[in-house]
């Protein structure tokens, strides 16, 4: 599997241009430590109208951090492509944590899927940003495709589960209070 994954990564390296390099570095920086999505969650949580969405985002991000970055990364202990082939010039600092799953992809899809499940109009651009973030991790040679795929799947499942639970709880609360 690593051979195919390296072939994909090397093909992306052949497509590099200065303009796309700069764009990918910027896009990936939005996922650094999840700060963009955490700030978005805090902002949404601070308004009554979007409080539940913000809470779902922050809950998803916390769960994903614990499951993906703290537990699974250390259990899988997968080396990064840039560790295995240091001859490829990186545009970002060499990451120090393990590769599987991609934390950037995980947090981006948690945030974007939460937004999409509450508001499709804003969810589509959020999902586009999440896809670009996931792609940037491949372009920048810091993750294997399966790392990114795992982050996407985990982020989607976690966000969907949190939102589904929150919406069920809201329906239950509405029924108990007599709201239609």
How would you name each of these model-derived features?
Residues 58-74, 124-137:
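Small-polar-interrupted transmembrane alpha-helices in polytopic inner-membrane proteins
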Residues 14-25, 45, 49, 53, ...:
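Membrane-helix interfacial "entry" motifs
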Residues 40, 46, 89-180:
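Membrane-embedded catalytic cores of phosphoryl/pyrophosphoryl-handling enzymes
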Residues 40-68:
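Interfacial segments of alpha-helical transmembrane regions
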Residues 19-20, 34, 49-54, 118-125:
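Membrane-helix interface segments
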Residues 1-36, 69-97, 173, 177-180:
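N-terminal transmembrane-helix/juxtamembrane module of multi-pass inner/ER membrane proteins
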């Amino acid at each position: 599997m690593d051979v195919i994954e390296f072939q994909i990564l090397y093909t992306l390296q052949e497509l590099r241009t200065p303009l796309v390099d700069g764009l990918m570095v910027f896009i990936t920086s939005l996922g650094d430590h999840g700060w963009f999505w955490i700030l978005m969650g805090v902002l949404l949580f601070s308004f009554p109208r979007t409080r539940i969405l913000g809470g779902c985002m922050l809950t998803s991000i916390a769960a994903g951090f614990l499951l993906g970055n703290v537990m699974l990364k250390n259990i899988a202990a997968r080396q990064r492509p840039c560790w295995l082939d240091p001859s490829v010039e990186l545009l970002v600092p060499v990451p120090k944590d393990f590769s599987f799953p991609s934390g950037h992809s995980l947090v981006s899809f948690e945030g974007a899927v939460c937004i999409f499940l509450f508001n499709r109009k804003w969810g589509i651009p959020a999902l586009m940003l999440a896809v670009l973030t996931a792609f940037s991790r491949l372009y920048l040679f810091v993750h294997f495709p399966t790392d990114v795929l795992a982050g996407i799947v985990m982020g989607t499942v976690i966000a969907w589960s949190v939102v589904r639970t929150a919406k069920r709880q809201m329906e239950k609360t509405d029924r108990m209070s007599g709201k239609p």
